[in-house]
Each structure stands twice: as C-alpha cells, then as structure tokens.
Amino acid sequence: MEMAVAVSRAIEGAYPLVVEASTGVGKTFSYLVPALLSGERVLLSTATKALQDQLFGRDLPALVKALQLPVSTALLKGRGSYLCLHRMEMARHDAGFPERSALRTLGKIEEWARVTVSGDLAELPGLDERSPVIPWVTSTRENCLGAPCPKFRACHVNHARREALAADVVVINHHLFFADMAVRESGVAELLPTVRIAIFDEAHQLNETGVQFLGKNLSTGQLLDFSRDMLATGLQLARGLADWQALSGATEHAARELRLVVGQAYPGSKLRWTDATPEGLHAREWAGALSSLLASLQAASDALGTVSEMAPDFVRLHERAAELAERALLFSRAAESGGVRWLEVGAQLRLVEAPLDIAKSIAARVFPPAQNAAKSWIFTSATLGDDEKLSWFTQPCGLTEARVLRVGSPFDYARQAAFYIPKNLPKPGDPAHPVAVAAAAADWARRLGGRTMVLTTTLRALRSIGDALQASFENSPDMQVLVQGAMPKRALIERFRQADQHEGRGCVLVASASFWEGIDVPGDALQLVIIDKLPFPPPNDPMVEARSRLLEAAGGSAFNDYFLPEAAVALKQGAGRLIRRETDQGVLVICDSRLAIMGYGKRLMRALPPMQRLVSEEELCERLDLLTRTCTKDRPPT
C-alpha cells in the first residue's frame, strides 16, 4: 500500500519517483493500479522480454478486468522479435542459408506465418531462441527496406507500432527505449511525446542497458552480414552491373584481416583502448587493417550508389555501407572525451565506444525545460542500492533530484532463512577455491536432496564448479547437475523447477551472470543458494577502469564509492533468489571469508536480508536436515 500511495502521489504531482520495493511487496500491482486509475496514457518498460510478456499477457489483463476499465493495451518489442515476411521469403532462395536441418525450422516458421496475427516469434512453440534461422527471418535497422518493401502493408513490426500508438497502455523493454533514444527508429520516439506517465520496472538494469545503446559499435559480424547481403542482392537483382563477388570479397577479407591482427592471444577478453591502438596490438597493422576496411566499404558504397534506383534493397544497402564506413572512420580516430573505448575479442571482434553513464540523457527527459509539461516517471526494482539515497542507481541515471522511497519486505527472514560463511575453504584467489566450493556444495546438496543453486561470479568458476559437481554425481541415480549453457535459460529454469516433482531426482543448478537476478523458483524446489565469491566488478574491465579513474580524479574512492556498492547490489540480488514467498524457507551460503574478516564485510552484510546467522558447519547441517524433514512439497501452492 505504501508504494501504491507514493506512485499515485507522483502521478498527481507530476514528479519523478525512485522506489526500491523488496521481494514480497507486490511491486507490479503497486504501480499498475494507480497508473491505470489515472486515466492517462502509460508507458511501461521492463528489462526482460519475459517480464514484458508477463505484464502484457497476465498482470495487465487481470487488473483491467478487476477494475472494469475501458483500457486498451499493446505490446511493442524490438524488430528482431518479429517475423519479417520479406526476409522469410528471401531465405528460401538464398544459397547461403544454413544446413539442411535449418530448412525444417524454416518450414515450421512458414507454416506458422500463415496463421499468426502478431508475428511475435515468442509465440511459436518449440522455436529455440538461439536458432540460427532467426536472423534469416527477422529484420534489423540496417537491412529493413522500409516503405518500398513489397511486404510493407503486412509488416508485423509496423502493425505492432500502429497498435502501440493507438493504445492507452504500452508495454516495451529497456533495450527498445534506448535503441530509440539512440537512433529514433523503433516507434517509441513517436510515442513518448504523447505520454506523461512512464514506469520502468527492473530499473536496476537501466544504466548498463543505456550505455550499450547510447555508444557506438562496429563488429566483424556486422561487416560479414553486410558483405553476404550485398553479394546475394547484387547477383539476384543486378548481375553484371558491378563485380559483386570482388566487392563482397574485399569487405569480407578486410573484416577477417582486422580479426587476424588480434590473433588468438586474447580470447573472450576486452582490450583497453586509450590511444590510437587497442592495448597489446601492433599499431601499424591495426591502422592498416582499418584503412583497408574503410576503402572496401567506400568502394561498396560507390557501386551500390550506381544501382540504388533499381530496387529498394540497394537503397538500404547503400545506406548500410555509408553507416559502416562512418563507424570505421570513427574508430580510426581518437576517442571522444567523457566516454570509454575498448575492443571485445571473441569469435568476432567488436569495437565499442560508450558513455560512462546515462545521467545526461535521462535527466534531460525526466526534468524537462520549464515550458514543457512535467513528467511522472517511476523507476522501481527490488534492488537499487545499499544506502538511503539509493545512490548506486540515482547518480549514474541522473536522478539525484528525484524523490526516493524504500519499502522493506514483509517476509520474516529471521524465521524463514539463515546464512552461513564457511571458515575452512581456501582464500577466494586460491586456484583450489572453485574445487573446494564444488566439494562442499556436493556434500550440502546431497544432504538436502538437491534443491540447490550455485551462483558463480565468473564463467571460469562456472566451468570449474560445474565440471566438478557433474563428476561428483556422475554415477548417482538420485541427483542431476544442470549447468548454464546446456540449454536455453528458460528451459533450464523449468527443468530445475520441475526436477523433484516429475523425475524424483534431486537437482543442482550451477549458473552465473543473468541467473543472479530475475529467477523466480518459489517453494521447495530451491532451498539452498551458494555464492562462490563476493561479486566485485572485474577490475580490468575497461568500463570499470574508466569509472574508477573518474571517481579517483574527483577525490573519491573507487573501492568505497564504486566496487563496494556494486558488490552490495549484486549480493542482494543473488540472495534474493532464495525466499520468494511467505512460506519459503532456505539457507544462503557465501563461500568467501572476506565477508567475515574484512572491515567492509559489515557493509556488505547490511545489504543482505536480516537472516539468522549460522556460525558453524554443524549448525548448517542441522538447518539442512530440518529443511529436509519439513519439506512442504505436498502442500497446495500458495
């Protein structure tokens, strides 16, 4: 109720509000009810498509019906979520289409295309979100033909945008919001001026999402896609009018040469790029590769310009060539001040330049000039900081002048949950630490009968702990180990959630990164969460380094003002996976002795819910045994 009243007042008073609403508060209904009752147009934005679908498909319809309001709603995603009818048709005839098995998937999509109304690929049963077919049947800003497209009238993206412009409540996601802010392409730009009330759920992801989109990037993947599209379109529609093989080959060769400059030395890393050349690379070779790339793109642009009147495909390809050349030129020059530049090394290269935060961009929209109408923008999440001002969120988002509210959880954590810090594990930096964590986790999971999630701070630890746990239970008919990456995230969570009920086997899930947040496994399926280390940001990450330097230059402390708040928020998010309902019970284990012995440990422990502290391995085992005896799996769901 406290949050609902605050949101209602912010809407009436036309001012921005930041709300940290802990698990169990009823955050979604607390902002939806006052927003719907306002009678105004409302924009809702979430961090994930999963919550976007939940809001549009479940929460909004239920409330609109309960309140008996004549409200129309619409769902708007990025163009990559919708089937492109033109590209689907082209894919069937493209010689470069993936292996034969992909043709079966394409056939299913073609069959579904005849009956779908929305064209939202999330509605197609059995389509793996990682399917290699998806890029062939969806459009990007770069390859969309726009109004000249032969399928323009039936376009699912345009239909979704028209519905959004006509609706009273529109549900979007943060990626779409910032993509539009960067290039004004998604349709949100037309929507925002008509909306006074905007609500950002899962707002803790706004800053990191925003810096991705408000910066610039160029990848070898983009270059190879362009090269492939130019070759296919040139041979199909303008054969003989230019040497499309040579033009395409030159761009492809330049992209691969750029990748070869880096070689195999830095797999999966981000290279600092503070001067003309990324760290560790040969300056002359790097400059030469960029120069060759720029020349190949210019030649492609010139050739495409001569045939642009023949078909809309060539107009868009000509624009893409110019955009890619502009980005190549940008990265051949010194970086702009106030941002950070780096090189991501993987199967492809990604050249990135980004702002350090989104403060200016958000503040300009939330606090408009006096002559413009004041806006009621609401920002909410279960985790927005570890101080009363929620500085971790408000400072980088330009919201230090916004009103702030923190609403505590109604859960009785002292009764429902306990946490433990093991004393005898190797230090976090010791190479033996991951194996020791896995051995301890195996013992605890065996005692509990599964129902365990191990959250790691790095992908390396994910692999080490995952491999060790799988080896521990390799011959066990009573326990299975699921490791992130083995299947799509949603399928992995569902398998973990249902393991005990349907298979009669215990289950341990080992995961990293995105599994620290947004995972909801209530009841007995999850009763033990193990965190391998304190989740400090990686100190050698270029963005982390740049933010640290900025703080130090301003007289602050990078550790106290950046690393600790980041760790506190991440720890709070990870711990939040444990207790999701008033009937849940469980144990949190943090396998990092620094939490108990370092002075900053007290600050990090204050970020955790007020759980009972277990002081010995014996107490932990007693608690796990108690959970086993009082398992509530036979209770009806609440």
Q: Where are these predicted regions, by residue range?
A:
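Conserved pre-motif I regulatory segment
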Residues: 1-19
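Walker A/P-loop NTP-binding motif
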Residues: 8-9, 28-41, 58-62
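Walker A/P-loop
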Residues: 13-31
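Signature of the SF2 helicase/ATPase Hel1-core->accessory helical subdomain module
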Residues: 37, 53, 58-61, 141-142, ...
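A substrate-engagement module of RecA-like helicase motors
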Residues: 40-168, 175, 266, 296-303, ...
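A contiguous, basic/glycine-rich beta-loop/short-helix subdomain that forms a polymer-engagement track
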Residues: 135-170, 181-189, 299-425, 432-439, ...
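Conserved RecA-like P-loop NTPase helicase motor core
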Residues: 422-432, 486-596
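Conserved helicase motor "Helicase C" RecA-like lobe of SF1/SF2 P-loop NTPases
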Residues: 457-485
